[in-house]
């Protein structure tokens, strides 16, 4: 079984989403023997944004990296993403990664009856952090976008582990992290994924 772990925060060791994504991964690695984890830090090792040269495949190194990104995603049974909310949405580095895996003919296809996802059978867990509180707010373009893009690729099991209001005060931050850690996938859920 393979797990793909991505982090998109620019805050390094001060990142709440990184702390939460690491806890999610630890929950899975602690319970699934032989779990192979592939990790990519999208801040330290970003996926290039799509450009005309990307489509023309004139940059061999970029084309090779794009194929590796795609293959890691296709091979993963579980995808864990540390995704902070930036300006009501996601970091551009995460969007660049999504642009490399949401590819017609690879992870979805168009039909006369509408798009069909080709990447089903995966479980996605998003470790989300937000300075304010945006759940059920019209300003939340992060979670709806991530749910939609993964559903478009055929992945309907998308779970969020969320810490909100972390910029309000140190106590809010601590409480939000504790609440998010308490909401990690249960041992039963992990066992069901491993089965």
UniProtKB/Swiss-Prot annotation:
TM regions (residue ranges): none
Enzyme Commission number: 1.6.5.-, 1.7.1.17
Catalyzed reactions: 2 a quinone + NADH + H(+) = 2 a 1,4-benzosemiquinone + NAD(+); N,N-dimethyl-1,4-phenylenediamine + anthranilate + 2 NAD(+) = 2-(4-dimethylaminophenyl)diazenylbenzoate + 2 NADH + 2 H(+)
Keyword hit for Hydrolase: no
Keyword Chloroplast: no
Sequence positions that bind FMN: 9, 15-17, 85-88, 129-132
Top-level division of the source organism's lineage: Bacteria
InterPro entries found in the cross-reference section: Flavodoxin_fold, Flavoprotein-like_sf, FMN-dep_NADH:Q_OxRdtase_AzoR1, NADH:quinone_OxRdtase_FMN_depd
GO molecular-function terms, A-Z: electron transfer activity; FMN binding; oxidoreductase activity, acting on NAD(P)H as acceptor; oxidoreductase activity, acting on NAD(P)H, quinone or similar compound as acceptor
UniProt-listed HAMAP family: Azoreductase_type1
Function: Quinone reductase that provides resistance to thiol-specific stress caused by electrophilic quinones. Also exhibits azoreductase activity. Catalyzes the reductive cleavage of the azo bond in aromatic azo compounds to the corresponding amines.
Quaternary state and interactors: Homodimer.
Protein name as catalogued: FMN-dependent NADH:quinone oxidoreductase
């Amino acid at each position: 079984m393979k797990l793909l772990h991505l982090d998109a925060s620019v805050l390094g060791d001060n990142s709440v989403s990184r702390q939460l994504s690491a806890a999610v991964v630890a929950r899975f690695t602690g319970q699934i023997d032989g779990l192979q984890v592939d990790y990519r830090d999208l801040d330290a090792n970003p996926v290039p944004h799509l450009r005309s040269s990307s489509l023309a495949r004139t940059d061999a190194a970029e084309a090779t990296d794009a194929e590796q990104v795609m293959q890691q995603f296709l091979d993963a049974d579980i995808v864990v993403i540390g995704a902070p909310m930036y300006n009501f949405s996601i970091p551009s580095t995460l969007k660049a990664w999504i642009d490399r895996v949401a590819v017609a003919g690879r992870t979805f296809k168009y039909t006369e009856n509408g798009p069909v996802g080709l990447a089903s059978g995966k479980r996605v867990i998003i470790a989300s952090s937000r300075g304010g509180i945006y759940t059920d707010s019209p300003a939340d373009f992060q979670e709806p976008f991530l749910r939609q893009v993964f559903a478009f690729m055929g992945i309907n099991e998308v779970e969020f582990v969320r810490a909100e209001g972390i910029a309000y005060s140190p106590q809010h931050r601590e409480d939000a992290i504790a609440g998010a850690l308490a909401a990690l996938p249960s041992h039963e859920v992990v066992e069901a994924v491993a089965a």
